[in-house]
């Protein structure tokens, strides 16, 4: 543990606070076990309904509940005796709730389900405008996911398959990538300083009103806010300190994030990217490949604990970066014009079509790794890998990255 003595004081303090907040969150965010409680709920649909012989089911967000600690949680709703897909996206019901291993399950009969009026906001207005302008199903689905953070559960099967099998499904999940692109594009519309302020205001508006408030968006927006403040005040910016600081705040105010895969995938992806770039000297191509490998390695063990991982994404991500940037650029311009400026919309759809066709081509033979890795195992592996990245320099960082990935290969069923 000699590396601990070499940690800068500021980083040591932030790391310690993060670990303390994690201990608090693991205790405060744990839901008590419940079984067979009939209570009142208001829920909002978070994905598509799935029809089965016994009824229909879908992921939902709990807007209101008689049990206070269930409010604001995501749950899985099963509607019994349903022979059709319920209309609407908001419902009230008296349901049987069961909580097991921090997961919430609600079941109710179809006659106990009542549709509620829709809550329209600026996000809904812009999404409707986008749907009116874009008729192709796959381009519409890509746009709704990329710009507005629509759940990947709402993607058409072919679109989900193409992005999932090539390892680029993260492109359709609003995260730091999207927040960073919005800031980069808006900040270039005005001169320095004014541009950074415009970019920050745009990101705050985008994160607050246009996309779901999921952990990656909150983390990325918080880190960007602190970076802009540091930049405008001519202060030194410590990326690792800010990552741990934002993580500390998120776990303190939203302790249930400590049980969220979304939070940890975002956290470790950014941590590995920052550690890969630390003490690394190389050209732009080398840095792009190392960043892509770092982001992949920082998420692969956790993903492997519940799904397959696709190594081809390490190459596809930097190769497709120009097209992804073009899609974001014309997407932001389309948002600014309320999708009323045809050239930007046409170029946005053209970029999206090219991305989709390239991924469709590679999806049929993209290799997939299915490792038998447990979540606890994945966390230990990621922590050890992060320590290895911190103490190495330059291309020596390939060693800890390689060890993490080789471990996943050795764990293949």
Swiss-Prot record:
Principal cellular location given in the protein's record: membrane
UniProt keyword list: Cell membrane, Membrane, Transmembrane, Transmembrane helix
Pfam families: Competence
Any one Gene Ontology cellular component term annotated for this protein: plasma membrane
Membrane topology: Multi-pass membrane protein
Subcellular location: Cell membrane
Record's keyword annotation contains Protease: no
Cited InterPro entries: ComEC_N (IPR004477), Competence_DNA_uptake (IPR052159)
UniProt-recorded name of the protein: Uncharacterized protein aq_1618
Annotated organism of origin: Aquifex aeolicus (strain VF5)
């Amino acid at each position: 543990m000699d590396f601990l003595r070499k940690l800068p004081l500021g980083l040591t303090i932030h790391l310690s606070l993060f670990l303390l907040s994690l201990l608090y969150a693991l205790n405060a965010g744990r839901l008590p076990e419940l079984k067979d409680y009939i209570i009142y709920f208001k829920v909002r649909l978070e994905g598509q309904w799935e029809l089965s012989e016994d009824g229909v089911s879908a992921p939902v967000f709990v807007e209101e509940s008689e049990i206070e600690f269930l409010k604001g949680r995501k749950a899985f709703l099963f509607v019994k005796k349903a022979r059709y897909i319920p209309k609407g996206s908001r419902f009230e019901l008296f349901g049987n709730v069961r909580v097991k291993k921090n997961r919430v399950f609600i079941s109710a009969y179809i006659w106990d389900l009542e549709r509620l009026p829709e809550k329209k906001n600026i996000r809904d207005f812009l999404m409707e405008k986008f749907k009116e302008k874009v008729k192709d199903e796959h381009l519409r689905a890509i746009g709704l996911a990329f710009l507005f953070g629509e759940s990947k559960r709402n993607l058409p099967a072919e679109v989900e398959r193409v992005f999932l099998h090539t390892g680029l499904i993260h492109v359709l999940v609003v995260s730091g990538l999207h927040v960073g692109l919005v800031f980069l594009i808006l900040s270039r519309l005005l001169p320095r300083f004014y541009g950074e302020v415009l970019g920050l205001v745009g990101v705050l508006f985008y994160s607050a009103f246009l996309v779901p408030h999921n952990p990656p968006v909150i983390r990325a927006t918080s880190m960007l806010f602190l970076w802009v403040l540091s930049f405008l005040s001519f202060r030194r910016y410590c990326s690792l300190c800010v990552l741990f600081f934002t993580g500390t705040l998120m776990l303190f105010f939203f302790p249930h994030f400590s049980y969220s895969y979304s939070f940890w995938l975002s956290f470790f992806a950014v941590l590995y990217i920052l550690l890969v770039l630390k003490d690394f000297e190389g050209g732009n191509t080398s840095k792009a490949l190392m960043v892509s490998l770092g982001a992949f390695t920082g998420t692969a063990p956790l993903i492997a604990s519940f799904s397959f991982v696709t190594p081809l994404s390490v190459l596809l991500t930097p190769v497709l970066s120009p097209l992804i940037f073009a899609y974001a650029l014309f997407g932001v311009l389309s948002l600014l014009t309320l999708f009323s400026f045809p050239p930007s919309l046409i170029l946005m759809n053209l970029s999206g079509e090219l991305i989709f066709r390239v991924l469709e081509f590679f999806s049929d033979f993209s290799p997939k790794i299915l490792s038998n890795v447990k979540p606890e195992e994945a966390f230990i592996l990621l922590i050890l890998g992060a320590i290895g990245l911190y103490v190495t320099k330059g291309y020596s960082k390939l060693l800890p990255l390689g060890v993490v990935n080789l471990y996943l290969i050795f764990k293949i069923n």
